[in-house]
From Swiss-Prot:
Its EC number is 2.1.1.77. Pfam families: PCMT (PF01135). The active site is at 57. Keywords: Cytoplasm, Methyltransferase, S-adenosyl-L-methionine, Transferase. One of its GO terms (biological process) is protein modification process. This is Protein-L-isoaspartate O-methyltransferase.
Length: 221
């Protein structure tokens, strides 16, 4: 399958629903974010290994999460689990689109606990032209980051035993967080949408999922 056919398939299946998510999917080439030996299958709708028992998520899961997040231009987004950088790039094309003036851009901060993968994500994002819109941090993302402002959106790309309290604390009022919660194995996991409204935290089940386990203080290790 090629890039265009993958996107057509995701639209036809109702995975990609909005024009902004479709536009981002079209602009980001997944082949730039997969290991060389997997480039021939870069546009198959499957997860692919990137080393250290980690994967790049299947495209349908990336865009399900992006749709649920309700991303908008100008937002500040935190990603926990950089992987190869692909998901962060697709978010950047919505909050800081390449055809929009930089004065209107938001930004993506992607946090990766694995030093090798943090370097991989940085390298891939730089080569693909996202270094001014996506900032890679090698740290324990489950513990949050000491930022000067609250973030509008958070996406966690690995399964946690529970929603990490520091991430709730980082969310702005009206902010949204998407996170897989459940077993460290590839079963018994639920994708949750969490909304912060004043002192209230509202949770909504989206679908059942299968993610690698989250590492860190509020993860599985």
């Amino acid at each position: 399958m090629d890039h265009a056919r993958l996107i057509e398939s995701l639209v036809r299946r109702g995975i990609i629903k909005t024009e902004k998510v479709r536009r981002a999917a079209e602009r980001v080439k997944r082949e730039l974010f997969v290991p060389e030996r997997y480039k021939e299958v870069a546009y198959e709708d499957i997860p692919l290994p990137i080393g250290d028992d980690q994967t790049i998520s299947a495209p349908h899961m990336v865009f399900i999460m992006n749709e649920v997040l309700d991303l908008e231009e100008g937002q500040l987004v935190l990603e926990v689990g950089s992987g190869s950088g692909y998901h962060a790039a697709t978010i950047a094309e919505i909050v800081a689109p390449s055809d929009s003036p930089p004065s209107r851009w938001g930004a993506v901060i992607t946090v990766e606990i694995n030093p090798r993968l943090a370097s991989l994500a940085f390298e891939n994002l730089s080569k693909a032209g996202y270094s001014s819109r996506v900032h890679v941090v090698n740290a324990d993302g489950s513990s949050g980051l000491p930022l000067r402002r609250k973030v509008d959106r958070i996406v966690v790309t690995a399964a946690a035993p529970q929603i990490p309290p520091p991430l709730i604390e980082m969310l702005a009022d009206g902010g949204k967080l998407v996170i897989p919660v459940g077993s460290p194995g590839f079963w018994g996991q639920d994708l949750l949408l969490v909304e912060k409204r004043g002192n209230n935290i509202i949770k909504k089940h989206i679908t059942e999922v299968a993610f690698v386990p989250l590492r860190g203080r509020y993860g599985w290790s």
